[in-house]
């Protein structure tokens, strides 16, 4: 990485930032703070990878399911609304949250403000509902893969819900299809967030370790 900022310029949701002195990554290093603005793969074609002039972002990657940005984990499971069997109504992060997502049922190409998209859920499933990998799997199962390209179909789930007991409570379970995009962390309505991204891990390393 030569800190050129090309990836920052092409990101459609402005998820990539150049680190400042206080961020702890090294001045000018591109990074994503998922809780503030996650990567939702709005571009489909991984524009940050295509824009990178040096190969610091691996040019062999062509599709979202191939990326490895980190791995999600439940950091505060006792606070999870789904585990408590609770629903959620309202703006996921409140009226002042500035993060954006691409809601394909509203606009295929243009991300909109999360604050402008309230929810009314009998059981909170926002982490799975908005997961870009799970959205793509659902599209592919319906016979409508993203951009009409079957290669965009993820081979594995990123997050699934498993029943807890006999009630409606559900446990979010991170699967080996997780790419660490951070949408689950960004959209979680609980503060502090229930789910976080470990940027020093990936699906490959976690599954190899059996953790």
Language model features by range: what are they?
Residues 2:
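Conserved catalytic residues of ABC-type ATPase nucleotide-binding domains
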Residues 6-23, 43-65, 88-104, 119-120, ...:
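Iron-sulfur cluster-binding cysteine motifs and their immediate structural context
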Residues 21-38, 70-73, 150:
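Gly/Gly-Pro-rich "capping" loops immediately C-terminal to redox-active cysteine motifs
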Residues 25-26, 67-69, 167-168, 205-206:
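Beta-strand initiation motifs
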Residues 29-43, 75-76, 80, 113-122, ...:
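Flexible gly/pro/ser-rich segments immediately N-terminal to CXXCH heme-c attachment motifs
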Residues 85, 107-113, 152, 169, ...:
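Long, non-transmembrane cytosolic or organellar matrix-exposed soluble domains/tails
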């Amino acid at each position: 990485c030569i800190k050129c900022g090309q990836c920052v310029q092409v990101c459609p949701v402005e998820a990539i930032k150049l680190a400042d002195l206080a961020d702890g990554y090294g001045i000018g290093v591109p990074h994503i703070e998922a809780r503030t603005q996650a990567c939702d793969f709005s571009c489909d074609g991984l524009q940050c990878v295509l824009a990178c002039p040096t190969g610091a972002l691996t040019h062999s990657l062509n599709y979202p399911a191939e990326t490895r940005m980190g791995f999600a984990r439940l950091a505060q499971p006792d606070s999870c609304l789904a585990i408590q069997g609770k629903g959620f109504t309202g703006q996921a992060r409140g009226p002042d949250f500035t993060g954006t997502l691409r809601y394909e049922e509203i606009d295929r190409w243009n991300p909109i403000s999360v604050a402008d998209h309230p929810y009314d859920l009998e059981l909170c499933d926002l982490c799975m509902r908005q997961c870009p990998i799970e959205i793509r799997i659902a599209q592919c199962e319906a016979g409508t893969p993203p951009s009409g390209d079957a290669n965009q179909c993820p081979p594995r789930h990123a997050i699934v819900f498993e029943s807890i007991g006999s009630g409606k409570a559900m446990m979010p379970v991170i699967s080996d299809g997780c790419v660490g995009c951070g949408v689950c962390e960004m959209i979680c309505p609980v503060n502090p967030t229930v789910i976080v991204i470990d940027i020093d891990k990936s699906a490959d390393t976690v599954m190899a370790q059996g953790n």
